[in-house]
UniProtKB/Swiss-Prot annotation:
GO terms for molecular function: cyclin-dependent protein serine/threonine kinase regulator activity. The keyword Nucleus applies. Phosphorylation by CDK2 triggers its release from CDK2 and degradation via the ubiquitin proteasome pathway. Essential for the control of the cell cycle at the G1/S (start) transition. Interacts with CDK2 protein kinase to form a serine/threonine kinase holoenzyme complex. The cyclin subunit imparts substrate specificity to the complex. The gene is cyce2. The modification Phosphothreonine is found at T394. Residues 1-24, 56-85, 385-408 are annotated as: Disordered. Belongs to the cyclin family. Cyclin E subfamily. One of its GO terms (biological process) is G1/S transition of mitotic cell cycle. One of its GO terms (cellular component) is cytoplasm. This is G1/S-specific cyclin-E2. It is found in: Nucleus. It comes from the Eukaryota.
């Protein structure tokens, strides 16, 4: 794999942004509303909702800086949504039983269970293989981590969104699973081309082709990128609309704060809380073992480490017992994040403050991975020497947690 150069900051403009008819539109404003947008919502009401968000949400309070991260997201109230009065019985022959109960609120334009099933189907249709490196004898898993870390840096330089990075990560992993005997000198070309495709799908003004070539310091020419683009899309069967890890996370976090909203239209949640949890996702995605778990399970398990079991079950539709394996796998990563300290929200010139948390940042995840490996070895040693298994952090019950907080 050629030496990856440090990206240079360039301004990017793009007036053209058409997508193939086989790919659904992924234009920005709200990842969570790709399929949840109400066409009848007026512009006035959207502005009112936007203003209310910033009036109600203040800066981080002192009580969020406690030792336990489980206070970051409030415990949900014990209420249930009213059943949708719309009669969908005449569609019964076209349905199948959902794997988990839909956590989505009632929607005025569609049945929330149908929307939820569609989301779950994405995880089943877009298959990934954590063992794909066995097909490539010349490659090592750490090469993937180095490549993804570099792509994060490219995204930060060009102010690309998190969804763009996670799309590129998905395209890269699924494409590599279809190939054999890829040499390491081709990895950077595959990676930058995956990001090129993702940017054209997700960004309103993606960087131009020559900028993607420039960022590789000439290692990948424009012709090579365009040729690889067609190869990747063909081998992926033109299936370019996965439900990414960060898309799942956006939905779960908005459901957690749905009681403050009138409509499930736009992502409205504290940005500071968002970046704390998404840092855990940015770190764990560098480990190829993350491909063992569905993206929805990864997002819900990451929330578990910053919340309580009741909330996770409510917003994700998964039982904690279903998430147990992934929760345990994430423990070394959560420990490394805690050791590294709290993330700060970065602001970018030309990017709205309300959209700042959606810009992919590069926070030195490769250095944190060294701590992850140390934590993994430590936990394995503890499991061998201790009769009680370690590795699963169980948050306290809500009532006990509140009493403990008051005592402090």
């Amino acid at each position: 794999m050629p030496v990856i150069s440090n990206p240079a900051v360039e301004k990017s403009t793009k007036d053209e942004g058409t997508a193939s008819c086989s790919v659904r539109s992924r234009k920005r404003k709200a990842d969570v509303t790709i399929f949840l947008q109400d066409p009848d919502e007026t512009l006035d009401s959207l502005e009112m909702t936007k203003k209310k968000q910033y009036q109600d949400r203040g800066p981080w309070s002192n009580e969020m800086t406690c030792k336990s991260p489980h206070k970051l997201i409030p415990t949900p109230e014990k209420e249930e949504h009213e059943p949708n009065p719309t009669n969908y019985s005449h569609f019964a022959s076209l349905r199948f039983s959902p794997v988990s109960v839909s956590p989505l609120p009632r929607l005025g334009w569609a049945n929330q269970d149908d929307v939820w099933r569609n989301m779950l189907n994405k995880d089943r249709i877009y298959l990934r293989d954590k063992n794909f490196f066995q097909k490539h004898p010349q490659l090592q898993p750490n090469m993937r981590a180095i490549l993804l870390d570099w792509l994060m840096e490219v995204c930060e330089v060009y102010k690309l969104h998190r969804e763009t990075f996670y799309l590129a990560q998905d395209f890269f992993d699924r494409f590599m699973a279809t190939q054999k005997n890829v040499i390491k000198s081709r990895l950077q070309l595959i990676g930058i081309t995956s990001l090129f495709i993702a940017a054209k799908l997700e960004e309103i003004y993606p960087p131009k082709l020559h900028q993607f070539s420039f960022i590789t310091d000439g290692a990948c020419t424009e012709d090579e990128i365009t040729r690889m683009e067609l190869i990747i899309m063909k081998d992926l069967g033109w299936c370019l609309s996965p439900m990414t890890i960060v898309s799942w996370f956006n939905v779960f976090l908005q459901v957690a704060y749905i009681r403050e909203l009138q409509q499930f239209l736009r992502p409205q949640f504290p940005q500071e809380i968002y970046i704390q949890i998404v840092q855990l996702l940015d770190l764990c995605v560098l480990d190829i073992c993350c491909l063992e778990y569905p993206y929805g399970v990864l997002a819900a398990s990451a929330m578990y480490h910053f919340s309580c079991p009741e909330l996770v079950e409510k917003v994700s539709g998964f039982k904690v017992t279903e998430l147990q394996g992934c929760i345990k796998w994430l423990v070394p990563f959560a420990m490394a994040i805690k050791e590294g300290g709290k993330s700060k929200l970065n602001f970018f010139k030309g990017v709205d403050i309300e959209d700042a948390h959606n810009i992919q940042t590069h926070s030195g995840c490769l250095e944190l991975m060294e701590k992850v490996y140390i934590n993994q070895a430590l936990l394995e040693e503890q499991n061998r020497t201790s009769p009680i298994p370690t590795g699963v952090l169980t948050p306290p019950q809500s009532n006990k947690k509140q009493k403990s907080d008051r005592a402090d």
